[in-house]
C-alpha cells in the first residue's frame, strides 16, 4: 500500500481531493478535521479506486492511527500496521496515551499486528 499513499492527494495538509486547501478557516482546529482526510484513509480509498485489494496488506504510518483510521484499517482487511517508533515518542500525553491505547485494543481484538520500527 505504501506506493499508493504518495499519490493520494496533492495537498500536504490532507485536503480531500478537489477541495481547496488554501481557505484559512479550514486550516484551524477543530474545523480542519471536517475538511481533511488522514493518510491512512487516503491510502485505503486510493487502493479501492485503483482496484487494488487491501486484504492481508501492511500499512506504514508515522504514528498510531486515530480511531477513525484504525476502524478503516480493520474494515479494509489490513493485517499489519508499521509505526515509526521515534515519531511516536512525540505523542506522549494523557489524551494520546488513552486514545492510542483504545486503538491498540481494537487492533488486538481484530488481529491486526502492530510493529514499531
Model-identified regions with their sequence ranges:
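Zinc-dependent deaminase catalytic domain
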Residues: 1-117
Amino acid at each position: 500500500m505504501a506506493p499508493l499513499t504518495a499519490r493520494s492527494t496533492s495537498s500536504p495538509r490532507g485536503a480531500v481531493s478537489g477541495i481547496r486547501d488554501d481557505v484559512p478557516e479550514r486550516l484551524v482546529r477543530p474545523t480542519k478535521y471536517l475538511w481533511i482526510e488522514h493518510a491512512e484513509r487516503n491510502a485505503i480509498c486510493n487502493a479501492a479506486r485503483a482496484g487494488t485489494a487491501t486484504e492481508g496488506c501492511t500499512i506504514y504510518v508515522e504514528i498510531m492511527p486515530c480511531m477513525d483510521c484504525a476502524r478503516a484499517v480493520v474494515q479494509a482487511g489490513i493485517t499489519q500496521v508499521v509505526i515509526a517508533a521515534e515519531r511516536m515518542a512525540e505523542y506522549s500525553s494523557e489524551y494520546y496515551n488513552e486514545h492510542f491505547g483504545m486503538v491498540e485494543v481494537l487492533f488486538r481484538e481484530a488481529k491486526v499486528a502492530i510493529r514499531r520500527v
